[in-house]
Amino acid sequence: MNCDTAQPWMMSSYHPSTTSDVFWTTTPSSTSTTPSSDNGIQQYSSISTSSGYAPANSPAKTAEVNQLGGVFVNGRPLPFEMRCKIVELSRQGTRPCDISRQLKISHGCVSKILTRFSENGTIMPGTIGGSRPRVTTPKVVEYIRSLKRSDPGIFAWEIRDRLISADICDRANLPSVSSISRILRNKNGGNSSSSSSSQLRYIRDQLAEQQQQQHLQQHQYMEYNNNELNQISGNLDYQVSSSNTPPSYDSYHFIAN
């Protein structure tokens, strides 16, 4: 077949739109060949904008479809309007599972937003990226240890309540139960310098004790040998006389041939 020959599908009256704005329809057309997932992505783009139009030059976002049929962007927080809707439905008595099915949002996302609202009173998302700031400051660690020393049978969740009642921490920087348990298990509090110095001190004490025992054993051995020699010399009754001593010479005396 000659590729240069015009085919019937090339002679159709379809012409692409030249307008700068594209309107995303919510109902798929009968002649459209776009998959259903693409329609969902287009619907999400129309919802995200204030008007019903999405600029053609807007950057493309990678959207995905969850198991409930809802569209989300991985790594991005839920829109503020959806967060408000979740809280409103929860105040009306709707269960989180029903909210999840109604809004097509995962149950974990709904539970996390409601938990954050009940604890901190906010529906705003946390920081995107980065790590959580350290909450186990030396002051908090020392207070936790003091509570454990005063009451050895106290639980970690009781320590969390004590930290809030004593104004040591608030809901934002309150350490978790696992962090408190880790602090209680680690008696040195993660202070590697103090642990290393204590180990060196213990080694020095052990070496000093060993040296002292060696000196004591040597002293006892020398005393035993001296006693044995005194007994032997007493039994022989050997007396040193002037005749038994060898002659002494001056340092400058020598014998000539």
Curated annotation (Swiss-Prot):
Classification via SMART domains: PAX
Span list, region Disordered: 26-58
DNA-binding region: 61-187
PROSITE patterns: PAIRED_1 (PS00034), PAIRED_2 (PS51057)
Region of interest: RED subdomain: 139-187
Polar residues bias: start-end ranges: 38-52
Start and end residues of each stretch annotated as PAI subdomain: 64-120
Keyword tRNA-binding among UniProt keywords: no
Highest taxon listed in the record's lineage: Eukaryota
Compositionally biased tracts (Low complexity): 26-37
Protein localization: Nucleus
One GO CC annotation: nucleus
Record GO biological process: defense response to Gram-negative bacterium; regulation of transcription by RNA polymerase II
GO molecular function: DNA-binding transcription factor activity, RNA polymerase II-specific; RNA polymerase II cis-regulatory region sequence-specific DNA binding
Keywords recorded for this protein, A-Z: Developmental protein, DNA-binding, Nucleus, Paired box, Transcription, Transcription regulation
InterPro entries per UniProt: Homeodomain-like_sf, PAIRED_DNA-bd_dom, Paired_dom, PAX_fam, WH-like_DNA-bd_sf
Keyword flag Nucleus: yes
Function statement: Transcription factor. May play a role in pharyngeal cell differentiation. May have a protective role in response to infection by the Gram-negative bacterium Vibrio cholerae.
The name this protein goes by in its record: Paired box protein 1 homolog
Gene source species: Caenorhabditis elegans
Lineage summary: Eukaryota, Metazoa, Ecdysozoa, Nematoda, Chromadorea
UniProt gene name: pax-1
